[in-house]
């Protein structure tokens, strides 16, 4: 038998000529993220079943990022533009993500039977421990929008030791007053449920402009096969209790918080009021110009930038690279840090619309983004 010989084959034309190892690593990461479709689970709770989707693998000594969406949306329609944004990939490779869908909001969800008692927002918050127990996760960083922001804030009040930080977009911590109820009832006589929800999600200026984004979400909500379920979630949101935040009082969020709202957004006044009631040493307030009612959809780059600095202020991603947004400017970053255990807990963001300089300022500072 002839002796086998080893033959070496060299590639005459590399597939990616001139590609650096760093670029190859980034391309591999992007492909891995693209192929990661997440694992969807359901767990029974005292208030019914809840569905959630997990992306990535748990990282030692790091919390999970847990999201909760607003009324009329699910986790994909609420958060995909943000978490698929290019600069966000540096964050999500460092944290496992849990995207919770409110009951009946997940894709393909059956319509609840007539007379079904939908959970209150407080009860939806009480479902989260069942999710974390199922996954064996001990702590989270919560990211919520609208009703989801309220739910995560309520959860943080009930379980402060399990929440390391909160990003609350468009939160309204107040129960509806009599005037709100009267306006809501009057609107209900002349507007459909989809139109009322769109008015909750977007500003009147956006709705009048009828951009492609508005057309897309109007179509999603109007033709949702689970519209009856959406109405139940909407009713629970409108029946929410007051969170009773009080600056300097016993009822407050005890973790770092970043409040986010768009300039002229439907919930701008509510978020401003919420900011006035929280601990200024723990709270950052990000008001985003030209972002409308859903900044995570319209300005994912700017929100990613702020989120990255928020995580750095908590002691994570200290070696994080600057994003394109900050590289395009003269950027300076300083920290005023107070140590809680081994972790820096006190950093707040500010941005000057005139100088375009990013910096960290004293706690309780407002960050207005108009770029």
From Swiss-Prot:
Keyword Glycosyltransferase annotated: no
Subcellular location: Cytoplasm; Cytoplasm, Perinuclear region; Cell projection, Growth cone
Record field: compositional bias (Low complexity): 347-361
GO biological process: cell differentiation; negative regulation of cytokine production; negative regulation of ERK1 and ERK2 cascade; negative regulation of vascular associated smooth muscle cell proliferation; regulation of platelet-derived growth factor production; regulation of vascular endothelial growth factor production; signal transduction; substantia nigra development
Modified residues (N-acetylalanine): 2
Modified residues (Phosphoserine): 326, 328, 332, 335, 338, 344, 350, 352-353, 355, 370
Stretches assigned to coiled coil: none
Assigned keywords, A-Z: Acetylation, Cell projection, Cytoplasm, Developmental protein, Differentiation, Neurogenesis, Phosphoprotein, Tumor suppressor, Wnt signaling pathway
Tissue: Highly expressed in brain, heart, skeletal muscle and salivary gland, and moderately in kidney and liver. Expressed in dendritic cells, but not in other blood cells. Expression levels are low in pancreatic and liver cancer tissues; absent in meningioma. Expressed in low-grade gliomas but present at low levels in glioblastoma. Isoform 1 and isoform 2 are present in brain neurons and up-regulated in Alzheimer disease (at protein level).
GO cellular component, one term: nucleus
InterPro entries: AB_hydrolase_fold, NDRG
Positions carrying Phosphothreonine: 20, 330, 334, 348, 357
Region (Disordered): 1-21, 334-371
Protein family according to the UniProt entry: Belongs to the NDRG family.
Subunit structure: Interacts with CTNNB1.
Role according to the record: Contributes to the regulation of the Wnt signaling pathway. Down-regulates CTNNB1-mediated transcriptional activation of target genes, such as CCND1, and may thereby act as tumor suppressor. May be involved in dendritic cell and neuron differentiation.
Protein name: Protein NDRG2
Origin organism lineage: Eukaryota, Metazoa, Chordata, Craniata, Vertebrata
């Amino acid at each position: 038998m002839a002796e086998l010989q080893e033959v070496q084959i060299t590639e005459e034309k590399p597939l990616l000529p001139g590609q650096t190892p760093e670029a190859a690593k980034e391309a591999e990461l992007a492909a891995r993220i693209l192929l990661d479709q997440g694992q969807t689970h359901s767990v029974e709770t005292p208030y019914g079943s809840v569905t959630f989707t997990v992306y990535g693998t748990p990282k030692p000594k790091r919390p999970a990022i847990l999201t909760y969406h607003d009324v009329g949306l699910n986790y994909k329609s609420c958060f995909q533009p943000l978490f698929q944004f290019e600069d966000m990939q540096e964050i999500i490779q460092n944290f496992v993500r849990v995207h919770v869908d409110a009951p009946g909001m997940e894709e393909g969800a059956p319509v609840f039977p007539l007379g079904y008692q939908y959970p209150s927002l407080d009860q939806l918050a009480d479902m989260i421990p069942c999710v974390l127990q199922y996954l064996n996760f001990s702590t989270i960083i919560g990211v919520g929008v609208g009703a989801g922001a309220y739910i995560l804030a309520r959860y943080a009040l009930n379980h402060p030791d399990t929440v390391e930080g909160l990003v609350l977009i468009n939160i309204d911590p107040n129960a509806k007053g009599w005037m709100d109820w009267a306006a809501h009832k009057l609107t209900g006589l002349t507007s459909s449920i989809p139109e009322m929800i769109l008015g909750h999600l977007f500003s009147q200026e956006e709705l009048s402009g009828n951009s492609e984004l508005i057309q897309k979400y109007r179509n999603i909500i109007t033709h949702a096969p689970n519209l009856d379920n959406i109405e139940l979630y909407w009713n629970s949101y409108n029946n929410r209790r007051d969170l009773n935040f009080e600056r300097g009082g016993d009822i407050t969020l005890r973790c770092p918080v970043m409040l986010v709202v768009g300039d002229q957004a439907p919930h701008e006044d509510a978020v401003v009021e919420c900011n006035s009631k929280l601990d200024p040493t723990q709270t950052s307030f990000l008001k985003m110009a030209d972002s409308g009612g859903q900044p995570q959809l319209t300005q994912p780059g700017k929100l990613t930038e702020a989120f990255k600095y928020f995580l750095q202020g908590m002691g994570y991603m200290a070696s994080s690279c600057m994003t394109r947004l900050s590289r395009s400017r003269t950027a300076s970053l300083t920290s005023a840090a107070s140590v809680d255990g081994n972790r820096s807990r006190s950093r707040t963001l500010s941005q000057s619309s005139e100088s375009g300089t990013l910096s960290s300022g004293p706690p309780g500072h407002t960050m207005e983004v108009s770029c």
